[in-house]
């Protein structure tokens, strides 16, 4: 009876010690879970590569998507960071860079290896690590060291492109034609890149013949935009805020709208609709978009002569519920020169490229989609890491919680599938999409201008990084630069253009009040440098104080338990 009592007492002490450890871990903290975190995980865009970049294709994945310079894989295996605290494996998008293309020496490719006795018509990009051009009998080919063999397959379904095969001897050089058959894809490698560039050149030629070029008089050249926003970008911001105000007014009345610096890649929302065969739409160069995961939607297939057709590619991220074939004869009805989507829509085809219209004699598989800007949202209640005490005291920046626009707008799976019964009319989203389609080229130019300003400013403030966080605050107050994004403040009335200037004035006032404080200037000015040491010092003292007590308690409990078992 005494042994049983001692054993229960020992178990109680172990349980109590475990609770103390849990409390200590909780004291140090895992960090708070951001509001809307599950939604953000659900709506992470594939090409954002939330799971990071890996060197090889993941062993366990359910879906893959071409992202231009890399391929995204939706993994679920036991890789690093894939286990979720809620139980089970957390899916995440991991990206693998595509094979490198080695540039030619002085612009002239060398001769092909002697092992290339036969020239393959296709070679998948997963079968080699890097490639370069070579010449044989006056023709240019690709050559690489074969890493593995592979059979051609319909990985994305029988209505999609055939994935190229890999033939040859592993470890030996292989050569293949840079132009693959029109219905074969090398998984986004150099062959697909050449096809995409060829389509762009064909479309440029069509546009050049369709629309006369504008010649500016030397005395009437357009003036540079400078640091101010052009009307197109302002329209995108205002339209986005209007839609956000209609769907989520609480968030819209106090928030930051953040645009990614560099080339914008809008998000595509697959929809169903009716295309028109009147050709009354403008044709422009395709632009990249960021699609969601796999979804069921109607598809459009273009059939034409392989020799004269324009291969726009085959969409990968969707399952076709139905396929409407647009043959060459159909597209020539009424002297039609292009296939037009409904207003506010685009065609999304191969390599995630969006087309405002499809030219005559196009070849491929496309879907209809609306697009929303590449904009993230920061709640106005989120503390923005302005360069005040944080940087004066040499503290690290706080992580800013960005909310994807799809989450902020409340676009659900029902919306993506074309469902009805939405709180806000789908017409509202299409209106925003139409605005973005019209201004996508100008939008790219404006954001690139802002990127140039960051680069110029970075050279000036290379030793004072705080300047990057108030970009253009002293140059007109355009936006706040946070984590490679350009953020604009908005309230219920719209975009507030003087917000950055007000923040700058408030920051100067706070710094002046801080430096005027005698405590701050104490210790001959060493106090700002001592503050960063207080946190680690306090943690060390706490560990040295509680550590021996915890270890002593655990040792005594284990010793008592062993003695109880022996007796």
From Swiss-Prot:
CC per GO annotation: host cell plasma membrane; membrane; viral envelope; virion membrane
Annotated positions for site Cleavage: 398-399
Cystine pairings recorded for this chain: 255-258, 255-487, 479-486
Membrane-spanning residues: 526-546
Span(s) of short sequence motif CX6CC: 479-487
GO biological process, one term: symbiont entry into host cell
Coiled-coil regions listed in the entry: 423-473, 483-519
Residue positions with a glycan: 245, 274, 280, 306, 319, 328, 335, 491
Keywords annotated in UniProt: Cleavage on pair of basic residues, Coiled coil, Disulfide bond, Fusion of virus membrane with host cell membrane, Fusion of virus membrane with host membrane, Glycoprotein, Host cell membrane, Host membrane, Host-virus interaction, Lipoprotein, Membrane, Palmitate, Signal, Transmembrane, Transmembrane helix, Viral attachment to host cell, Viral envelope protein, Viral penetration into host cytoplasm, Virion, Virus entry into host cell
Cytoplasmic side: 547-567
Oligomeric form and interacting partners: The mature envelope protein (Env) consists of a trimer of SU-TM heterodimers attached by a labile interchain disulfide bond.
Function: The surface protein (SU) attaches the virus to the host cell by binding to its receptor. This interaction triggers the refolding of the transmembrane protein (TM) and is thought to activate its fusogenic potential by unmasking its fusion peptide. Fusion occurs at the host cell plasma membrane.
Protein's name according to its UniProt entry: Envelope glycoprotein
Gene: env
